[in-house]
Each structure stands twice: as C-alpha cells, then as structure tokens.
Amino acid sequence: MRRASSCGGAVAGSPSEAQDGGEDDGSLRNDTSHMSFEELLELQSQVGTKAYKQLVTGSSTKKQSSRPPVQKGCVADKHRPLEMSAKVRVPFLRQVVPISKKVARDPRFDDLSGEYNPEVFDKTYQFLDDIRAREKELVKKQLKKHRSGEEHEKLQHLLQRMEQQEMAQKERKRQQELRLALKQERRAQAQQGHRPYFLKKSEQRQLVLAEKFKELKRSKKLESFLSRKRRRNAGKDRRHLPLSKE
C-alpha cells in the first residue's frame, strides 16, 4: 500500500509543475507580442535562434509523445497480465503449449521387450511354419498357371526367396540343436565330477559343417553342393590371377 501511495504522489506532482511552466511561457509570449520588430531582432541575437523560436511559438523542437509516460517503477498489481507492444511481430511457428519430443523406439533392441531367446521364440511362433508352407504351395500353383511373362518372373523370385528363408531357418535350428547337445554334454560332465570343456567358435563351426555334410549325404545332394562350391572357388581364384598381357 505504501508503494502505491508513493507512486500516486509522484504522478500527482508532475501536472502542477507542468502547469507552472506553462504559465511562465504564456507570460513571456504576451511580453514579446508588444515588442517592436527591432526589439525582437535584438532579443533573437541575444538568446539565439533556437531559443527564440521556442519562446515565440511555445513548442519544443523535439516531438513530444501524446501518450502519458510509463511508470516503470510503479506496479499496481504484480499478478496482472504483462503489457506488450502490439507492434512486435508474432513468430510464425509460435509454440503455445510445450510438446514433448517423440522418441522412436525399436522393440527389437529395447530392454522393455525382454531378452531374445531363439528357442522360446520358435516355440511361441511355431504356427508360422504351417502358414509359410501353405503360402509356398499357393505360389507354386500360381506359378504353374503363369508360364511366362512378368508375373511368372515375380512368382519365381518370390518362390526362391521363400526357399532361401526356409533353408536359413533349418540351418538356424540345426545350430540350436547342436548348442543344446553340447550344453547337455557339459552338464553331464559336471555331474560326473569332470571339468567341462568349452568348444571354440572355430570348432563349433566345424561341427556344424560336419552335420550339414551328413544331412546333404542323406538327401543325396552332396555332389551338387560340392560342384557349386568348386565353381564358386574357381571364380574367386580367377579374380586373383594377374591379367594376361597382349
């Protein structure tokens, strides 16, 4: 309350001072109105042209603002809205309400999705194998209908892709079975009091390759596999040979 009264007193005192100054300027202008032209020229030479014009016209050379002065030190209510100039340009992308940044989350690599266990995953989604088998048979039927053309190429490419995925899944299952067998063997050695032996990755790859050869031999596809491998290795060797000079 004291702050408001002090501000009010400061504002109330300013008009009286302005009124006294206005009366003095009016009396001086009345005096100059009765002076002769020679006296006015002499007065102008004494006080200067700028002061003489201000005295005769009664206006300052500087433009005075018609708005009342802003009392910066006096605040009537601190809870009132902030006054801002209407001439300030509002930004085009003004953010009124803060929006939290969206963070992309991949469930495959997120801890909230749990730890990936291939054995549990295969048991949970085992029904997908039957769906893939039915889709493969459907693609084969469609391939028999379209013997040539662009549709035939698309179906052929799709069938090859499905067969490659099936082979990769079988290979992954074979490796899982091998790891499970090694784990059971180490557990049996520990129960018998022997120190368990952990195979190196190179030894595990050799075991997987041996199992793959056994599977190919049982299915009578070993010769075709070896011939493809020999052709692939021969192509690699030719790339490393120096070019013949003509």
Curated annotation (Swiss-Prot):
**Keywords, in A-Z order:** Coiled coil, Nucleus, Phosphoprotein, Ribosome biogenesis, rRNA processing
Query: Quick one: where's region Disordered?
Result: 1-35, 57-78, 222-246
GO BP term, pick one:
maturation of SSU-rRNA from tricistronic rRNA transcript (SSU-rRNA, 5.8S rRNA, LSU-rRNA)
Q: What is its main location?
A: nucleus
Instruction: Please give the InterPro entries that the UniProt record associates with this protein.
Output: RRP36
Q: Which residues carry this modification: Phosphoserine?
A: S60, S65
Where are stretches of biased composition, namely Basic residues? 227-246
**What Gene Ontology cellular component terms go with this record?**
90S preribosome; nucleolus
Report the sequence similarity comment from the record: Belongs to the RRP36 family.
Question: By what name is this protein known?
Answer: Ribosomal RNA processing protein 36 homolog
The gene name reads RRP36
